[in-house]
């Protein structure tokens, strides 16, 4: 969530004419992230987030916006898109699609503990099940076809050793994706980017017995229909990792995965290919971070992520595959 497209006070005043949200009290850009232009918007009616979509088209956007509405209606805490005066959920700002959504309660937890991982695991499983009857389909746009396109553009900027790893893992994942086992894995709408900065936590009520409460998941604009296990792997690779080495923290990983499977038990096929999917989750973000680092787009507040972080994670997952916690598996 960076700022690629500037919005002046005059721009905002014209845009807000299409909403019944009262008067603007405060408006500022959000400097984190790398994909869209995002702004905190406070009005006399409440707190919101304005997003200008830098890459998604108006034809692609309904999948994401409608998915958030669908999940919210099924009790999953996500930002709710705000309707414009004509009933639509997004419009056009500076020639690009744009939308306003409600702002979730809480703050990001950048040093998550066991309790945070339990909350995330349970809600991720609930989100997957809630999306089963979502009628629209949009593939994960940062999956194998995109990797195949991006890798040749990255190769000139990296070392021979990195190239060997990048191309070798691409071949491994291509074979995995082509397998009957992969085709049989459960699938549906996935967040595909559920990092620790894409969830918020608030203080739990005193009578709950918990110290934290999940405020919700946000930034669904990398979402797509994919294998649920991929979504779990992406989440574990961020929430349950030692940031200095890339190794999994066994306690946090076990907590998140056990919490997930209390809601949706893993299948036998998912257990068999957990290691492959952990590698896929690491590879996806190594490729995208290499691409964004070496082939950046102009942005007023862009802060590119370190590609080396996910290179370390990928090497760790290749060396230490790990296993899902033991419990009864579905077929």
From Swiss-Prot:
What's the protein name? Homoserine kinase
The Enzyme Commission number assigned here is 2.7.1.39
Any one GO molecular function term: homoserine kinase activity
* UniProt record similarity statement: Belongs to the pseudomonas-type ThrB family.
UniProt entry keywords in alphabetical sequence:
Amino-acid biosynthesis, ATP-binding, Kinase, Nucleotide-binding, Threonine biosynthesis, Transferase
Q: Which HAMAP family match?
A: Homoser_kinase_2
Enzyme class, spelled out: transferase
Identify the InterPro entries for this entry: Aminoglycoside_PTrfase (IPR002575), Homoserine_kinase_II (IPR005280), Kinase-like_dom_sf (IPR011009), Pseudomonas-type_ThrB (IPR050249)
The record lists the catalysed reaction(s) as: L-homoserine + ATP = O-phospho-L-homoserine + ADP + H(+)
Question: To which pathway does this protein belong?
Answer: Amino-acid biosynthesis; L-threonine biosynthesis; L-threonine from L-aspartate: step 4/5
GO biological processes: threonine biosynthetic process
SUPFAM superfamilies named among the record's database cross-references? Protein kinase-like (PK-like) (SSF56112)
């Amino acid at each position: 969530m960076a700022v690629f497209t500037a919005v002046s006070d005059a721009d905002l005043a014209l845009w807000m004419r299409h909403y019944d949200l009262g008067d603007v009290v405060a408006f500022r850009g959000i400097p984190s992230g790398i994909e869209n232009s995002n702004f905190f918007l406070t009005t006399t009616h409440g707190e919101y987030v304005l997003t200008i979509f830098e890459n998604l088209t108006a034809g692609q956007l309904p999948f994401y916006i409608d998915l958030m509405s669908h999940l919210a209606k099924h009790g999953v805490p996500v930002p709710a898109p705000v309707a414009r005066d004509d009933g639509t959920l997004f419009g056009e700002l500076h020639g690009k699609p744009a939308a306003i959504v409600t702002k979730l309660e809480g703050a990001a937890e950048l040093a998550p503990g066991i309790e945070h991982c339990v909350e995330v695991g349970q809600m991720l499983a609930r989100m997957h099940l809630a999306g089963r009857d979502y009628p629209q389909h949009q593939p994960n746009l940062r999956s194998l076809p995109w990797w195949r396109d991006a890798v040749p553009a990255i190769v000139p900027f990296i070392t021979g050793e990195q190239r060997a790893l990048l191309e070798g893992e691409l071949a491994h994942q291509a074979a995995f994706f082509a397998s009957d086992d992969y085709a049989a894995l459960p699938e549906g709408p996935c967040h595909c980017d559920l990092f620790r900065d894409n969830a918020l936590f608030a203080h739990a009520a005193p009578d709950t017995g918990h110290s934290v409460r999940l405020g919700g998941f946000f930034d669904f604009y990398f979402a797509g229909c994919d294998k649920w296990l991929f979504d779990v792997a992406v989440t574990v690779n961020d929430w349950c990792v030692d940031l200095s080495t890339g190794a999994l923290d066994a306690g946090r990983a076990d907590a998140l995965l056990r919490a997930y499977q209390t809601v949706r038990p893993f299948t036998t096929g998912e257990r068999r290919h957990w290691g492959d999917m952990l590698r896929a989750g690491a590879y996806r973000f190594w490729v995208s971070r290499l691409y964004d680092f070496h082939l950046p787009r102009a942005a007023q507040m862009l802060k590119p992520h370190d590609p080396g972080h996910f290179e370390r994670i990928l090497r760790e997952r290749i060396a230490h595959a790990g296993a899902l916690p033991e419990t009864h598996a579905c077929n």
